[in-house]
Amino acid sequence: GNINIPKLGINYPILATTTEQTLKVAVTKYWGGNPNEVGNLCVSGHNYKNSKFFGKLLNIKNGDTIQISDLNGKTLNYKVYDTFIVDPQDTSCTSQLTNGKIEVTLITCTNGNKQRLILKAQEI
């Protein structure tokens, strides 16, 4: 799949697995189902100082649009509805309980890798 956040100039492929190596070259599927399916697709990416990958996520606001394309080329629009910061061991944001909705969660490090910035969005 692919993630596009026009407001931030973010446009990257989503790799299927999360490892130290894949996170160095792309954003990755951390947890959940396939792109644009019912459930909560969790995508992780590094927060590099040069704004690469998810380095600009702090600039996103509720109501902003994220686009996710699946492997069949279908693109869905998602509206950001929540952003918050958690400790690295808090994985509650990866819950698959979405009441039948299609959601995406973006995860990146913040505060010098001491915490995680979480961004939640739902299909519109």
Where in the sequence are the language-model features?
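Solvent-exposed, non-transmembrane regions of membrane-associated and secreted proteins
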Residues: 1-124
